[in-house]
From Swiss-Prot:
Family: Belongs to the universal ribosomal protein uL4 family.
Gene Ontology biological process terms from the UniProt entry: translation
Alphabetized NCBIfam families for the sequence: rplD_bact (TIGR03953)
GO CC terms: ribonucleoprotein complex; ribosome
Recorded superkingdom: Bacteria
Function: One of the primary rRNA binding proteins, this protein initially binds near the 5'-end of the 23S rRNA. It is important during the early stages of 50S assembly. It makes multiple contacts with different domains of the 23S rRNA in the assembled 50S subunit and ribosome.
Keywords: Ribonucleoprotein, Ribosomal protein, RNA-binding, rRNA-binding
Protein name per its UniProtKB record: Large ribosomal subunit protein uL4
The gene coding this protein: rplD
């Protein structure tokens, strides 16, 4: 698959051949769904907690005798039917993470890249370097390219001045190639890869 290469100023910088085994796969929404669920489950803090009956402060004495009162029998003031009582089978602190095979994760990333390529939402840049490191200069370049909600993926090292210029722009994310992931690719309208990123991603995902 051939793709045009642009510069940050919107000029043509030749073309690049993208591997069909990474950028030309059929789009499988089931895989993308599984990957997003897996990523978000790993991020979830899981700090929810309610007190069980053994954790509630209060007396352990029986509220009143078993028989002769005319009331339903009760064994503890800490039971859930009483005000201030325990929660039964409530949430506990736990990890929400679940397993997903490495092959599925690899295929999911390739599918996300392919989905962007097939939707015409993939741009390849010659390089992502900012000379000034100023946000206003980068905003002007993004306007020329017609980009708003965008994810930039560079090679192993992101240009320091580019990252500095980009960090205060809402809707713009910058990642090194090793940080490429399905969730961040899908949540932005456009995916921008540098030639260096394409090279490393193809090597890693072949």
């Amino acid at each position: 698959m051939k793709c045009d290469v642009k510069t940050l100023d919107g000029k043509d910088a030749g073309s690049i051949e993208l591997s069909d085994s990474v950028f030309g796969l059929p789009v499988r929404t089931d895989l993308l769904h599984r990957m997003v669920r897996w990523q978000l489950a790993r991020r979830q803090a899981g700090t929810h907690k309610t007190k069980g009956i053994s954790e509630i402060s209060g007396t352990t004495a029986k509220p009143f005798k078993q028989k002769g009162t005319g009331h339903a029998r009760q064994g503890s003031k800490r039971s859930p039917q009483f005000r201030g009582g325990a929660t039964i089978f409530g949430p506990v602190v736990r990890s929400h993470a679940h397993d997903l095979n490495k092959k599925v994760r690899k295929l999911g990333l390739k599918t996300a890249l392919s989905a962007k390529a097939q939707a015409g939402q993939l741009i390849v840049l010659d390089q992502a370097i900012s000379e000034s490191g100023k946000t206003k200069d980068l905003l002007a370049q993004l306007k020329v390219l017609g980009l708003e909600k965008v994810l930039f993926i560079d090679g192993p090292e992101v240009n320091e001045k580019f990252a500095l210029a980009a960090r205060n722009i809402i809707g713009l994310d910058v990642l090194p190639q090793q940080g490429a992931n399905v969730y961040d690719i899908l949540r932005r309208d456009t995916l921008v890869l540098t030639k260096e990123a394409v090279k490393h991603l193809e090597e890693r995902l072949q």
